[in-house]
Amino acid sequence: MGSKNKLKRFNENETFDNVFQPKREELVEATYKMKGHWNAKYFKNDNPLVLELGCGKGEYSVNLAKKYPNKNFIGIDIKGARFWRGAKTAIEESIPNVAFLRTQIELIDYAFAENEVDEIWITFPDPQIKYKRTKHRMTNSEFLKRYKKVLKANGVMNLKTDSEFMHGYTLGLLHGEGHEVLYANHNVYKQEGSPEEVTSIQTHYESIYLEQNKPITYIRFKIK
């Protein structure tokens, strides 16, 4: 994507009511105005709040919002030029129950209050395979601690990935730390019992992975 195109998308994001782009200091140096108030101030209801972390173009968030109109969805990514597409689609198609937040995943507990979130999706994250990149894996112990801060007591996590490494690493970590694995599937399109929302929604890149015959894996779990 050219720099002019990126700039155009950044500028357009500023005009979207469904896009939130707080500066880092707004999050860490004071209580962010939306923290603890996403449902009341933006969605104007008490429906379950669901996050998608590293949402990319926002395809999954938008399609989940279409599928579950009685839930509220927020796609989170540091790259606003990416989720511009999802935000624009939501406006064009009048989808009221999805919004987008531009921030680092590491700051999630600054953007959301304790017990504010019902469910979290992590879709096709960078597996950060090199050992020195372990701290950046979105299911490592430190990230799980952050997620637990904002999740309700019965909140659930979902990991959907084409990376067999990420799938295996996460399963091992969950079992090793005593978290509750509710469901695990090594190939959601070939094994029976896959949740419908896992197989009925496909991102652009997921379609490419499937054309390459890469298995798509899925884990649903609770953080203890």
Spell out what each predicted region is.
Residues 1-49, 59-66, 87-114:
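S-adenosyl-L-methionine
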Residues 71-74:
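Short beta-strand element of Class I
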Residues 139-153:
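A short glycine-rich, Lys/Arg-flanked "PGG" loop and its adjoining helix->strand segment in the class I
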Residues 54-56:
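Class I SAM-dependent methyltransferase "Motif I" SAM/SAH-binding loop
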Residues 154-161:
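Conserved beta-strand signature within the Rossmann-like core of class I S-adenosyl-L-methionine
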Residues 177-224:
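Class I S-adenosyl-L-methionine
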Residues 79:
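Conserved SAM/SAH-binding beta-strand->alpha-helix loop
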